[in-house]
């Protein structure tokens, strides 16, 4: 049993974007609270040492390659996760990217990369995982946002738009 304030023993959590930063912090907190983890990143090899760290907390963990911009990658991740764990209880939609530059310099490719990763990817990962949560009649989806969803910052136009979209999407799905 976990010593944490919120006991998640017996639950499985998927955290997208766990190769570094916030994703690793979220995964550590979930593991310390007793959850087993599905760690995801575009580069599975970048997760392997972190997977061992999670296992050192006495939790089960797997590392799965996931590009949230690719529907087949999402489908494969869910299949691998479901095969490894009997249920998928928690999703932390954390994967994201940013290209910080003045609006006048943002390219079509920059815009698509940011929106496809941060907004479209979050939606379709949530959709795929929610189908499994509905079968079990239990699940929690946490979408990671940003203050840029409510305040404008120079050089963060596409990023702010994507996070504003996440904010609206989250309210719509709730």
What are these regions (language model features)?
Residues 102-103, 110-115, 141:
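Substrate-binding pocket helix/loop in short-chain dehydrogenase/reductase
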Residues 126, 162:
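Active-site helix of classical SDR
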Residues 104, 151-157:
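Active-site loop immediately N-terminal to the catalytic Tyr-X3-Lys motif
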Residues 146:
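Residue(s) in the substrate-gating loop at a strand-loop-helix junction
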Residues 45, 66-77, 108:
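The beta1-alpha1 cofactor-binding region of Rossmann-like NAD(H)/NADP(H)-dependent oxidoreductases
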Residues 35-49:
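Conserved glycine-rich Rossmann-like NAD(P)H-binding loop of the short-chain dehydrogenase/reductase
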Residues 12, 19-21:
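Conserved glycine-rich cofactor-binding loop
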């Amino acid at each position: 049993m976990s010593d944490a304030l919120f006991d998640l023993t017996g639950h499985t959590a998927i955290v997208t974007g766990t190769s570094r930063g916030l994703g690793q912090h979220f995964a550590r907190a979930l593991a310390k609270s007793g959850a087993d983890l599905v760690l995801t990143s575009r580069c599975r090899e970048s997760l392997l040492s972190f997977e061992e760290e999670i296992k050192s907390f006495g939790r089960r963990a797997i590392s799965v390659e996931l590009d949230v911009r690719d529907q087949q990658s999402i489908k494969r991740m869910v299949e691998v996760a479901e095969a490894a764990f009997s249920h998928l209880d928690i999703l932390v939609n954390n994967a994201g990217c940013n290209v910080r530059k003045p609006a006048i310099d943002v390219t079509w490719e920059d815009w698509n990369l940011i929106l496809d990763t941060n907004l479209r990817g979050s939606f379709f990962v949530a959709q795929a995982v929610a189908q499994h949560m509905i079968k079990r009649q239990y699940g929690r989806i946490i979408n990671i946002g940003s203050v840029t969803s409510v305040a404008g910052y120079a050089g963060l136009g596409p990023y702010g738009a994507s996070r504003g979209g996440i904010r609206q999407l989250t309210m719509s799905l709730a």
